[in-house]
Amino acid sequence: MSLWGKPKVIGYDNGIIAVKEIHRDTANAIIIDNHYSHKIYNASYIHLGVYVGGELTGVLQYGSAMNPASGASVVSGTSIENFLELNRMWLDDKAGRNSESQAISCSIKYIKHRYPQVKWIQSFADERCHCFGIVYQAASFKYYGEHTNVFWELDGEFYHNINMTLSTESRRYKNNVGGARTLQENKERAIKHELRQFRYIKFLDKRWESRCLLTEQPYPKHYMAADDI
């Protein structure tokens, strides 16, 4: 195992999978082409390429939460710079078995060294993926329960409810961030869905775990149907 770059750490290699920072445009293009949402998240600012045998086979993008100030309601004393969300992840099937959890683990080791101000990482498994977060379980994230969010489906794409409720005078709407303008201009055709999201947290600084305001819960089983849990 090795950390690349001196004095600035730029990646992490576990001997099988390597991650290193890549240009935002490169990462965004891969996500748009391959991620199930086909949409980027503009608040992502850590863009990591995933390499197997020297070949770029995937991307992980970390950044702010949709509500950056929400961290303190999850872990007491959290400032915006103290936590990240895994906003987007895509790996090619040729990356191999267990590549997702390995890539996440490598990315966490990298972030811990490169961004020491980050104390915890949060991610959500989306019910649309039908797996309830088994990748995060394999990467030793802890599970903190589920909640239901409203999504809107338009022409085969899903949009978070926040994009339906944004003011038409807001910058996000005018710039069509997250497809807000597209969604609202076509709201009569949009289909409403209520979908569960499963919250996972990884504490990079174990001392911060005691500050968590949520109760850790047993992992949901990925093979259970939605009505069973």
What are these regions (language model features)?
Residues 45, 195-200:
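Short hydrophobic/aromatic beta-strand or adjacent loop that forms the aromatic wall/cage
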Residues 31, 44-64:
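Conserved beta-hairpin
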Residues 37-45, 53, 67-72:
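An active-site-proximal beta-strand-loop segment
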Residues 213-229:
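Short, cationic low-complexity segments
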Residues 21, 63-190:
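Acyl-donor binding region in acyl/amide transferases
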Residues 171, 208-214:
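Hydrophobic helices that insert into or interface with lipid environments
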Residues 2-42:
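Short amphipathic alpha-helix that is part of the acyltransferase structural core
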Residues 15, 54-60, 81-84:
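Glycine-rich phosphate/pyrophosphate-binding loop shared by adenosine-nucleotide-utilizing enzymes
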